[in-house]
Amino acid sequence: MSKVTVQDIEAVDDYWGPTFRSILEGNNTKQIGDQLEQRIRSHDKEIERICNLYYQGFIDSIQELLQVRTQAQQLHNEVHSLDTSLRQISASLIQQGNDLVRARQIESNLASAIEALKSCLPALECYMKFTQQAKNKQYYQALRTLETLETEHLTRLKTHNYRFATQMQIQIPIIKENIRRSSASDFREFLENIRKFSPRIGELAITHTKQLQKRDINAIIAEHMQQMNGGEAGGAGAGGDDDGANVSAQDLIDFSPIYRCLHIYMVLGQREYFEKDYRQQRRDQAKLVLQPPPNMHDNLEAYKTYICAIVGFFVVEDHVKNTAGDVVTSSYLEDLWSSSLTKFVNEISMSSSSCTDPNILLRIKNLIMLSINTFKCYGYTVNILWELLHNMRDHYNEVLLQRWVHVFREILDKEQFLPMVVQNTEEYECIIERFPFHSEQLENAPFPKKFPFSRMVPEVYHQAKEFMYACMKFAEELTLSPNEVAAMVRKAANLLLTRSFSGCLSVVFRQPSITLTQLIQIIIDTQYLEKAGPFLDEFVCHMTNTERSVSQTPSAMFHVARQDAEKQVGLRICSKIDEFFELSAYDWLLVEPPGIASAFITDMISYLKSTFDSFAFKLPHIAQAACRRTFEHIAEKIYSIMYDEDVKQISTGALTQINLDLMQCEFFAASEPVPGLKEGELSKYFLRNRQLLDLLILEEWSTYFHDYGKQENRYHLVQPQSIIVILEKIREADKKPIFSLVRKNDKKKLLETVLKQLKHIADRQN
């Protein structure tokens, strides 16, 4: 470091730090300071020398400078004046230049703005168009415009990065969703309107079908020619004749929402979703439409609204199928129709089965017929509806039968069941017109004329024809052949007469107020009604335009009623016989009988004679049956009167009196009280009584015991136990003093012996 010189320090150009560090770290600071002093003095001398050398030149220069100073000042003034003048002159130019620059800049900016606006204008115009379309609910067109905006215009503006374009790009999905929701809302409103107007649409479709059914081919051709020749004027005139004739579903319902919604979902790529949603919504609506209103069974308007709503529903579906592509497919519609038809048939069947008004049922049938024809016009299968009508026909006939039961009851309640008498020709002809009856004897007879039947006969015959006509009304247009219709009407008529009317007659038969004479007249009336059966069949043939075919023999029509009547005749006579026997008043301890039959027997026989004579020739079979039943009952009464538990004693005289009464009855039976009976047929009913009384009176005990158990037995109908009961009553009577005096001891012994033997035989039988 000691070797460092001032020259070394001066030679350092870059960084003096190391040099100063070495100086400070060394011990030769004083030496370096001396060197620096010497160096400074050397430089001062050099400066002085140079100054002395150039001093004269400097003085000269100063002098020249002083000389130039005046000129410079003058020049300065001139320059300043010139500058001021130039400034004044150039100020306007500078202003104009600046204005020109600004104008050029504005012009450039305007050109750029115009160019930018030109590039943005299609997008803005497209957006304005979309906004207007959306405001007018032209959603499909709006989506198309939005698609153009998104795919064309906004794509071109991506490079410019406009904020409004970016905002539009962000808003487009939201706008699409809003459009979808708005169109879906319109679609829901459309579905609600469809549901509301379905009954009206169905009613118009049914009305149109009804009008078409009334028109023939000539009228259709004439109308077509009129439309061809008359053009629009003719069409307008035709439309004015009938306000609702040409109104269709699209006239009542605006179907544009479904088309718009379909197109919107197509643009959004959600067509399949829309189709599924539409079908599901319509299925749900079908369930609501198929729900019948409450208390529909007896409300015709409810039936009409219900049926029209279903018809309108499927008319709308058919229209959508034909106009909206695959929204309603054939398979979907067939499936919906099949399930809905089954539900519809079940509801109508259940409701109509509770209906008891044939007029309502007939109108329901007409509504269903019109709906069938309407459905057929739209291509729907309706076979199950025909089955429904056939089932309703059976129920309708049953309802008619119930109604005619009330009609018959009213007729029978008012009837006196006496032969009808007419006073003049007008009344006579009125009866002949209402009932097919011809009798020359009656026709030639003078007035007043007496018919063999009561007023009930023509009334019932007329009501039977009315019933047939009512049955025929329902069978019209049921795709049945005339023979099938005729068979149906005959079957219903047979049920009417054999079941309903016969049932009413059976009720009348059992009325206590009906006398035997009236009962017999009713039976006679039924015979005339049976004879009128072929005329009823002829009436059926005339209504159905078929050949005559008797389905049931007239004699069998009131078979059940006649059996009941025969039974009632027998019961009435037997009841009268019981009244006579209540007057018997036998003296069971009679010693000697008067020798004649009892008075009640004589009165009873007189009654039976007059009774049988009154209808034996009119009703021979019934008279014969009643006669058999009567004599059987008399025999049972005579037999039971001896075995009455209240009768404790029977004298021989009492037995003789009973024998006289029995003989009187046997004589009456042998006198053929009713023609046509076999000889001895009635006497057999008294045979048991005869054998018993003969055995008791004749006392042929040896014969009885000898023949007992053999085939040829004179007293084969008399059982030992029966004889024992009577003999014990005779023995009790013999205990009386009046009989003890006259009865011999051997008679008593004989009676005891007979009783022992009879009891022995009875014990063996047991």
Curated annotation (Swiss-Prot):
Residues 28-90 form a coiled coil. One of its GO terms (biological process) is chaeta development. It comes from the Eukaryota. Keywords: Cell projection, Coiled coil, Exocytosis, Protein transport, Transport. It is found in: Cell projection, Rhabdomere. The exocyst complex is composed of Sec3/Exoc1, Sec5/Exoc2, Sec6/Exoc3, Sec8/Exoc4, Sec10/Exoc5, Sec15/Exoc6, Exo70/Exoc7 and Exo84/Exoc8. Interacts with RAB3, RAB8, RAB11 and RAB27. This is Exocyst complex component 6. It comes from Drosophila melanogaster.
